[in-house]
Amino acid sequence: MSDPIIIIGSGFAAYQLVKSVRRLDAHIPIQIFTADDGAEYNKPDLSHVFSKRQTAADLVVKSGEAFAEEYNVQLHAHTQVERVLTQQQQVVANGRCYPYSKLVFATGAQAFVPPMRGDGLAKVMTLNSLQEYQAAEQPLSRAQHVLVIGGGLIGVEIALDLATSGKQVTVVEPNARLLANLLPEFIALPLEQQLMKHGIQLALNSRVESVTEQGQTLAIALHDGREFAVDAVLCAAGLKANTAVAREAGLSVERGICVDHQLNTSDPHIYALGDCAQIEGRMLPYLQPIVLSANVLAKQLVGQEARLTLPPMMVKVKTPSYPIQLAGDFSPESHWQVQLSPEGIVAKAQSPLGDFTGFVVTGEYVTQAFPLLRELSQRANG
């Protein structure tokens, strides 16, 4: 019997890959190594647990054991892979060596916590996994005032959800506007106004200097001298790919594990996908590229030829009171055709040569997102 495919990780990317492989081959041996219990859950739901009053248990779609049985895989739960021996094609976990025919890193990313001072740093929570929500669930349910570090996609979604659930919320963001790396200024400003309508306090151009325990509360000091007393601190300041084991194994690693359009790393027997993978220089921490990557990699693993082609992809900012959808490429040099109304915004980006390169739609105009995406895809293909 040939050595199995080994997958390190049990998040969305890993399980999407298993499902894609099983559609092609019901019997090829697969082993999954995961540091947690391997439960299947929908990670984007973590941004909306407070308004829906969901517990960590509510988010579980399937236990790790049930997933393993349904998809005919061997699950090594609570088993951390310590090393990869590339010459021997083995992974080392709990002091044992496990051989592989092909190895897949689906190790995801961890929440980035910016450097801060103070004796309250151990109380700073993150919400990047089911296990992190399990740890944060009780403190956050008791908290009246929550400070969110980070005004990017996840930070904004969580802040609005916390406010919708009745909590006082302060967002600290080092950039001059929210979603600075994703949205043009004329879209970010109405979003900020919507958040403030929900009572959310915004501290832009700011960063947290220190978190200090003060009885039952946390004293927050910003770099500009402002201070807050809050009940909880939640950090949503971005992600850092989990690459330590890959780097130690000698694989090419930059911001993520470097892969080509076949998801192959610098080792011909090792692949990577999901939040840990850097695809031809790009980090793509969204669901659609992971699904497309899983389909391509599944074919590779069963001996078929496939190559990842990424079409223009939609990004949704799931802020119910002011929904935003966008796709394509735009930059400070882009020219914008903008349609403004009380119901929302339709904005189309053009290159200096006049080519349609991307769009942003908000409010009631999100219904125009898919026709615009179709138009963008046709131009990209054509």
Swiss-Prot record:
For this UniProt entry, what's an example GO CC term?
cytoplasm
Pfam families assigned to the protein according to its UniProt record, in alphabetical order: Pyr_redox_2, Rbx_binding
What InterPro entries does the record point to? FAD-bd_OxRdtase (IPR050260), FAD/NAD-bd_sf (IPR036188), FAD/NAD-binding_dom (IPR023753), NO_rdtase_NorW (IPR023961), Rbx-bd (IPR041364)
Asked if the record carries the keyword Oxidoreductase, the reply is yes
- Swiss-Prot/TrEMBL cofactor(s): FAD
Its pathway is:
Nitrogen metabolism; nitric oxide reduction
UniProt main location, coarse: cytoplasm
Which EC class is this protein assigned?
Answer: oxidoreductase
Q: Any idea which UniProt keywords this protein has?
A: Cytoplasm, FAD, Flavoprotein, NAD, Oxidoreductase
According to the UniProt entry, its GO molecular function terms are:
oxidoreductase activity, acting on iron-sulfur proteins as donors, NAD or NADP as acceptor
Catalytic activity field: 2 reduced [nitric oxide reductase rubredoxin domain] + NAD(+) + H(+) = 2 oxidized [nitric oxide reductase rubredoxin domain] + NADH
Enzyme Commission number, as recorded: 1.18.1.-
Localization per Swiss-Prot or TrEMBL: Cytoplasm
Q: Which family, according to UniProt?
A: Belongs to the FAD-dependent oxidoreductase family.
* Protein task: One of at least two accessory proteins for anaerobic nitric oxide (NO) reductase. Reduces the rubredoxin moiety of NO reductase.
Name this polypeptide is given:
Nitric oxide reductase FlRd-NAD(+) reductase
The species this protein belongs to is Vibrio vulnificus (strain CMCP6)
